[in-house]
Amino acid sequence: MPTLAFLLDVDNTLLANDDVKKDFDEHLQVELGPTLTRRFWDIYEQVRHEESVVDIPLSLKRLREQVPLPELDEQTYLHVHSIFDNYPFVNKLYPYVFETLAYLKTLGTTVVVSDGDLIFQAEKIVNSHLADAVGGRVLIYTHKQERIDDIMKNYPADHYVMIDDKPQILVDSRRIMGNKLTVVFVKQGKYSLEKFPDGFIPDITVPHISDVRNITAEQFLAVKQGK
């Protein structure tokens, strides 16, 4: 049978990132109050727009630079920083994530391929034990669909399966990899109702990441085999 490599996203694919953000907001409201909390999220969105990626460390840095000490003393700022540094990400993994990764490991190579700021995403993946679950096979890029060649070079396989919640990433990756890639759309999180562009239809759609356990190797390979 051809060798398989599974390229797994993190945010809203393996981990309920929308819920994480709600938790952050609740903690920030306690530490900062409503005005500075809104200020932080405004900075967060500004950074996301400028960098085309979420960057928590840069957002925190700008918060410190833009808010004077009388409004945000250093101790409070350090408490805010610790909210992000010490968050128990493992508690926000979707049900049966580890079982799903263990199942996929019986079919091929499992690789976490995430995008975002390199520091915060790395902490998230390690602290949630996802890195351990895939044997340390973790790649983080600012925009992973722009690094397909690097992904394939690091983890060569006859066929690839990308499991992701973001329609545009799946479309872009298929455009690059063609029939060497099976795309699996996981309908979780804020992109779950987003339509695919140009009538694109994912090869496989599942409502929950745990449903991936019901897919056989033959089904993952069906696109390559022209079925």
Residue ranges and their predicted role:
Residues 22, 26, 57, 118-122:
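Short, surface-exposed alpha-helical segments at coil->helix boundaries
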Residues 1-2, 126, 130-162, 166-227:
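Asp-based, Mg2+/Mn2+-dependent phosphohydrolase catalytic module
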Residues 13, 118-119, 168, 191:
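Conserved Rossmann-like nucleotide-cofactor binding loop
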Residues 20, 34, 45-85:
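A metal-dependent, Asp-based hydrolase signature
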Residues 82-112, 145:
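Short, acidic loop-to-helix structural element flanking the phosphoryl-transfer center
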Residues 98-111, 115-139:
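Substrate-recognition/cap helix-loop segment adjacent to the acidic, metal-dependent catalytic center
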Residues 1-43:
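Active-site neighborhood of HAD-like aspartate-dependent phosphohydrolases
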Residues 9-10, 15, 113, 163, ...:
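Short hydrophobic segments within beta-strands
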